[in-house]
Regions:
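Small-residue-biased structural context
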Residues: 13-181
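Sec-dependent N-terminal signal peptides
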Residues: 4-12
Length: 181
C-alpha cells in the first residue's frame, strides 16, 4: 500500500508544479481517460513501427504485421486497462469518482483479460524478434534501439500499470462497499 501512496503523491505533486494550462494529467469528475503521457507513448511507438513499414525488404513486411498487432493491443489497453490510472490524482486527493461501478467493471475486465494481454505482449515480442532477425541482413540499426524501447514499455505495463489499475479497482470496491454500509 505504501508504494501506491507514494506513487499517487508523486503524480499529484508533479501535476500541480506547472501552470494549469500545462497540466498534462487529466483531472476529471466523470469518465476516466488514459493518462495523456501513456497515450502519447503509444502514439510514438506506433509512429516508429509505421516508419519501419516503409522499408522495402522483409523487415518492412514484418513491421506491417507488428503495427497491426500493436495497434489492436494499444486500443485494448486504452479501452479498459489504462483509464483507471487517470483517476490517480482524484483518488490521491481522497475523492471517490461518481462512476466507481463503471471503473470497477473495467478493472474486473482487466483481471479476466490479464493472461490475454500478457500473451499479446509475447506475440509482439515474437514479431519484434523476427523483425530484428530480418533487419540484420539489411542494416537497420534503428530497429534494435526500438526493441529496447518496446521491451521497456511492456515491462512498465506488466510491473506497474496493470497492477496499479487492479489496485485502483480493489480500492474502489472497498470504498464503495463501506460507503453503502
Amino acid at each position: 500500500m505504501k508504494p501506491y501512496c507514494i506513487l499517487s503523491f508523486l503524480i499529484l505533486l508533479i501535476s500541480q508544479c506547472r501552470p494549469k494550462e500545462q497540466n498534462y494529467i487529466t483531472q476529471f469528475p466523470g469518465k476516466p481517460e488514459t493518462p495523456s503521457s501513456i497515450k502519447r507513448e503509444h502514439e510514438q511507438l506506433l509512429e516508429h513501427v509505421q516508419a519501419f513499414t516503409l522499408f522495402q525488404d522483409s523487415a518492412g513486411l514484418v513491421a506491417i504485421k507488428l503495427h497491426e498487432i500493436m495497434e489492436h493491443h494499444f486500443q485494448e489497453e486504452e479501452d479498459y486497462v489504462l483509464p483507471p490510472l487517470g483517476l490517480l490524482p482524484l483518488l490521491a486527493g481522497g475523492q471517490l469518482p461518481e462512476n466507481s461501478r463503471e471503473i470497477i467493471g473495467l478493472t474486473d475486465k482487466l483481471q479476466s483479460q490479464l493472461s490475454h494481454l500478457n500473451a499479446e505482449h509475447q506475440l509482439i515480442k515474437a514479431h519484434m524478434d523476427e523483425m530484428l532477425k530480418t533487419s540484420a541482413a539489411f542494416n537497420h540499426p534503428e530497429i534494435k534501439e526500438f526493441e529496447k524501447q518496446l521491451l521497456q514499455h511492456a515491462k512498465v505495463e506488466e510491473e506497474i500499470y496493470f497492477p496499479a489499475a487492479l489496485v485502483i479497482g480493489e480500492n474502489l470496491k472497498v470504498k464503495t462497499q463501506s460507503k453503502h454500509e
